[in-house]
Amino acid sequence: MRLDKFLKETRIIKRRTIAQQLAKNGKIIRNNIALKPASEIRSGDELELFLRSRFLKIRVLSEKEYEVIEEKKIWGG
């Protein structure tokens, strides 16, 4: 499944266009590599997301499920 679609379907991010912008700006990382919006996501992947006011590290369980590994509030968005 595409990264932007996964983030929208799981409701981590409300709009697919916002997910695309985050990816284009290098705010979504897997294995120390910034992902593109069309990057394929598979179960077992660990993603790091730098959102406006928080850092989120998740593990993909399926196309519609994930588990939060780490979550931190950050300032300066």
Q: Model segments located where?
A:
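Strongly charged
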Residues: 2-5, 9, 16-77
